[in-house]
Curated annotation (Swiss-Prot):
A GO molecular-function descriptor: diadenylate cyclase activity
Record-linked Gene3D superfamilies: 5' to 3' exonuclease, C-terminal subdomain (1.10.150.20), DNA integrity scanning linker region (1.20.1260.110), DNA integrity scanning protein, DisA, N-terminal domain (3.40.1700.10)
Start and end residues of each DAC domain: 9-147
InterPro entries: DisA, DisA_sf, DNA_integrity_DisA_N_sf, DNA_integrity_scan_DisA_link, DNA_integrity_scan_DisA_N, DNA_integrity_scanning_protein, RuvA_2-like
Biological processes per GO annotation: DNA repair
UniProt cofactor(s): Mg(2+)
Protein name, as recorded: DNA integrity scanning protein DisA
Length: 360
């Protein structure tokens, strides 16, 4: 998923949340669906939308599922306010530009598609004959599906995510050992970032399912949160540890990674280039030392500004690991108590890493 795809996905997620099961809007849509009356609903009252309205009734009443259900019995379109609090117009005739191309066949769906493309607003078309709800957003189209179908797909995606998480944990555990022994290669770092991005892209897909499921997606959401614990933070700290380019901040480098297409992500050269390394075969075998952000973040009660001071003082993880309590105490913002906490914390982190390595 590229950055543009991710942005579009975020937009559709917001729309799906508006009409997910358990919401007032979805209740109204489901009532219309059950009554088989069909409907054309525009969400938004911008000047572009109102310029397409011909006739109808100005309602300006609070939105309720019962009100929209009754108004849908009339043939014309219903115009809702952007915040979904008001029903503004009912039985309105929409007159979009007929030169706007559309692949839709039915009159209602053609109008919905053209209005969405012309105004950029969300338009909902409920088919009287096929009994389905179709959402139009700009040039995008999305058909709402039944909850059991979405749940099945979400659970399948969760299984894939669990497999990716196992692979990522193995890669991270391997990186931990290599960092302690100071034998990390660029290839090792790129591989971990690749695995992380693969996992995050499946997670983005599951987030869309959760948005569409609404109140039915609580369990899926809890499972997703558990699987993603520390993944985002670790990815950013890995970039902090290894990126050598100075023209971008770590979060901007992360965004560059997330803009890679799937095929680009599969080529580790692209990841290395984003980190600032020369894209050649020899670079993969280059031994590089982490600055220490990620492993230091595992020590409780050590804020990021203190970690930055440590990195500034000792340059890299090995320098920090080899520092005495007295040397740690000399770092800005670190007193004797915190120096002891950091020194002991690093020892515990190393012990845990060696314990985890035996499970590999």
């Amino acid at each position: 998923m590229t950055g543009l795809d991710r942005k579009k996905d975020d937009e559709i997620i917001e729309v799906l949340r508006m009409m997910a099961p358990g919401t007032s809007l979805r209740e109204g849509l489901d009532n219309i669906l059950l009554a088989r009356t069909g409907a054309l609903i525009v969400i938004g009252d911008s000047e572009k939308v109102l310029s397409l309205v011909d006739g109808g009734f100005y309602i300006n009443k609070d939105y309720t599922p019962a009100h929209i259900y009754e108004l849908a019995k009339m043939d014309g379109a219903i115009i809702l306010s952007k915040d979904l609090k008001k029903i503004l117009y009912a039985n309105a005739l929409l007159v979009p530009d007929t030169s706007i191309p559309t692949a839709e066949t039915g009159t209602r769906h053609k109008t919905a598609d053209r209005v969405a493309k012309q105004t950029g607003e969300v338009v909902v078309s409920i088919s009287q004959r096929r009994n389905i709800i179709t959402i139009y957003m700009g040039s995008r189209k999305y058909i709402l599906r039944e909850t059991p179908v979405i749940l099945a797909e979400a659970n399948q995606a969760l299984q894939t995510l669990e497999k990716y998480k196992v692979a990522l944990v193995e890669a991270i555990n391997n990186l931990n050992i290599l960092e302690i022994e100071d034998i990390v290669t660029l290839d090792d770092v790129a591989f971990v970032l690749q695995r992380t991005e693969m996992l995050m892209r499946v997670a983005a897909e599951i987030e869309r399912y959760i948005s569409e499921l609404g109140s039915e997606g609580r369990l899926i959401s809890l499972q997703l949160d558990e699987l993603l614990t520390n993944v985002d933070a670790d990815e950013l700290f890995i970039i902090e540890d290894y990126a050598i380019r100075t023209d971008l901040r770590s979060d901007e480098i992360l965004e560059k990674l997330r803009q890679l297409s799937y095929d680009e992500l599969m080529n580790l050269v692209n990841i290395c280039s984003i980190l600032g390394y020369s894209p050649n075969a020899d670079a993969f075998e280059m031994v590089i030392s982490p600055r220490g952000y990620r492993l230091l973040s595992k020590i409780p009660r050590v804020p990021v500004n203190i970690i930055r001071n440590l990195v500034k003082k000792f340059s890299n993880l090995q320098g920090i690991l080899n520092a005495s309590i007295e040397e740690l105490d000399d770092v800005a913002g670190i007193g004797e108590v915190r120096a002891r906490i950091i020194w002991d914390g690093l020892r515990r982190v190393q012990e845990q890493i060696f314990l985890d390595s035996r499970k590999l």
